[in-house]
């Protein structure tokens, strides 16, 4: 869409699931590179296409990479995609409890597990990465809990953790922030799309820096 809400482009075929350059199964996130290339995370659930699809700014298919699996370059329910200020593509491989990092041609560069089960990824201009984890618990990802982890996107070092503000963060996995962004003043916003075990269900929550 344009900044005024006008539809500019449609990718995929409405009402039809599938593979190839003209179909998706469950696109869950999108990232735009500095040159206008479009990267789509196609695989909201573990049985979807589980791939990253790349188009140019005119919507012309360029390439895709990934399939269902556990190895580097394979995914299970990729739920988030974002491009850091260095141009690297960060993919939230949620059901594998990891972030995979690629260059823009799909070459695998690194795998990080210290951010939990990533549902949303964002960056600021001060070297920080923000990762929303809405699913970690003692069953799905032992040793981790739901929350927003803040670290350094160059090194992967995690130095801050925002616990979700209800009494027991380990009940009802999937009910925390699934989407995260940050403003120019460092305030953090977490989108909570699923009913939570507190009165502020389905909300956008602001955490003041």
Where in the sequence are the language-model features?
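Eukaryotic scaffold repeat domains enriched in small/polar residues
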Residues: 1-209
């Amino acid at each position: 869409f344009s900044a005024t809400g006008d539809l500019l482009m449609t990718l995929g075929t409405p009402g039809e699931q599938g593979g190839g350059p003209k179909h998706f199964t469950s696109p869950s996130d999108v990232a735009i590179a500095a040159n206008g290339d479009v990267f789509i995370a196609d695989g909201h659930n573990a049985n979807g296409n589980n791939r990253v699809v790349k188009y140019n700014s005119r919507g012309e298919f360029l390439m895709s990479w990934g399939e269902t699996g556990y190895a580097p370059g394979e995914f299970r329910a990729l739920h988030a995609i974002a491009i850091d200020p260095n141009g690297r593509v960060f993919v939230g491989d949620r059901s594998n409890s990891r972030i995979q990092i690629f260059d823009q041609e799909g070459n695998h560069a690194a795998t990080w597990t210290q951010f939990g089960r990533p549902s949303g990824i964002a960056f600021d201009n001060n070297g920080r990465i923000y990762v929303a984890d809405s699913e970690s618990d003692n069953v799905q990802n032992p040793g981790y809990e739901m929350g927003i982890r803040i670290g350094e996107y160059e090194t992967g070092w995690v130095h801050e953790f925002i616990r979700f503000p209800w009494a027991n963060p380990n009940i009802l996995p999937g009910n925390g922030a699934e989407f995260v962004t940050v403003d120019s003043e460092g305030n953090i916003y977490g989108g909570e799309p699923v009913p939570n075990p507190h009165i502020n269900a389905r909300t956008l929550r602001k955490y003041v820096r």
